């Protein structure tokens, strides 16, 4: 167990919290991180690419000329692949690029990503993010007080509408919950701001 400073929204220290080394201080497994990031990126692909093969192209039902006697090569349809406007051979078809990863590997990837952020001094623990109403200006002030870079991932224990709406119009700032935490979001951000309760929940799930 290691102690981490807990900050208030004004940037001052309010105390400290003990977090498990098994979640926030392991040696990052780069191979598993690589696989987890590839998996997420593959799942984000639309996979809607499509072309028409010779059966899908319109027309070509009639034989263009008779089989013999013209001196030309025999042809059965003007929609065969060798014709201009004909069907495509072995073209892309709609498909899903997503695949699965074992649960243990997914959790190891998350622990590795969090530990990597801790090693980079890119993890900030705050006591709470209590906003009375969605205020972008107020939330920008909070991030400024916490001395955060432009690309920030904000993690709350559960869905917080005020925080989500406040951060929505700030470029580079993304909000997620402890349950929705994922490797791609963590590694894409320059810094992770996590509430104390969210950190405990992540520790409970991954520990």
From Swiss-Prot:
Region of interest called Disordered, as start-end residue ranges on this chain: 53-76
Keyword tags: Ribonucleoprotein, Ribosomal protein, RNA-binding, rRNA-binding
Family annotation (InterPro entries): Ribosomal_uL4, Ribosomal_uL4-like, Ribosomal_uL4_dom_sf
Pfam families the record matches: Ribosomal_L4
Signal sequence coordinates: none
Biased composition (Basic residues): 60-71
GO cellular component, one term: ribonucleoprotein complex
SUPFAM superfamilies assigned to the protein according to its UniProt record, in alphabetical order: Ribosomal protein L4 (SSF52166)
MF-aspect GO terms: rRNA binding; structural constituent of ribosome
Keyword Oxidoreductase: no
Keyword Flavoprotein: no
GO biological process, one term: translation
PANTHER family (UniProt xref): 50S RIBOSOMAL PROTEIN L4, LARGE RIBOSOMAL SUBUNIT PROTEIN UL4M
Record's function text: One of the primary rRNA binding proteins, this protein initially binds near the 5'-end of the 23S rRNA. It is important during the early stages of 50S assembly. It makes multiple contacts with different domains of the 23S rRNA in the assembled 50S subunit and ribosome. Forms part of the polypeptide exit tunnel.
Family (UniProt): Belongs to the universal ribosomal protein uL4 family.
Subunit details: Part of the 50S ribosomal subunit.
Name under which the protein is recorded: Large ribosomal subunit protein uL4
Native source species: Staphylococcus saprophyticus subsp. saprophyticus (strain ATCC 15305 / DSM 20229 / NCIMB 8711 / NCTC 7292 / S-41)
């Amino acid at each position: 167990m290691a102690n981490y400073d807990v900050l208030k929204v004004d940037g001052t220290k309010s105390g400290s919290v003990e977090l498990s080394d098994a979640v926030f201080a392991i040696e990052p497994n780069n191979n598993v991180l690589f696989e987890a990031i590839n998996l997420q990126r593959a799942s984000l692909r639309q996979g809607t690419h499509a072309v028409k093969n010779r059966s899908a192209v319109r027309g070509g039902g009639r034989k263009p000329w008779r089989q013999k006697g013209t001196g030309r090569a025999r042809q059965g349809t003007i929609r065969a692949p060798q014709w201009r406007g004909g069907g495509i051979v072995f073209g892309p078809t709609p498909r899903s690029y997503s695949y699965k990863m074992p649960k243990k590997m997914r959790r190891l990837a998350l622990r590795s990503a969090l530990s990597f952020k801790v090693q980079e001094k890119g993890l900030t623990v705050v006591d709470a993010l209590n906003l009375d109403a969605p205020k972008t200006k107020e939330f920008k002030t909070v991030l400024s007080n916490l001395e955060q870079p432009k690309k920030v991932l904000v993690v709350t224990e559960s869905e917080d509408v005020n925080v989500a709406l406040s951060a929505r119009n700030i470029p580079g700032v993304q909000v997620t919950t402890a349950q929705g935490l994922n490797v791609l979001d963590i590694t894409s951000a320059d810094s992770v701001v996590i509430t104390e309760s969210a950190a405990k929940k992540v520790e409970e799930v991954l520990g």
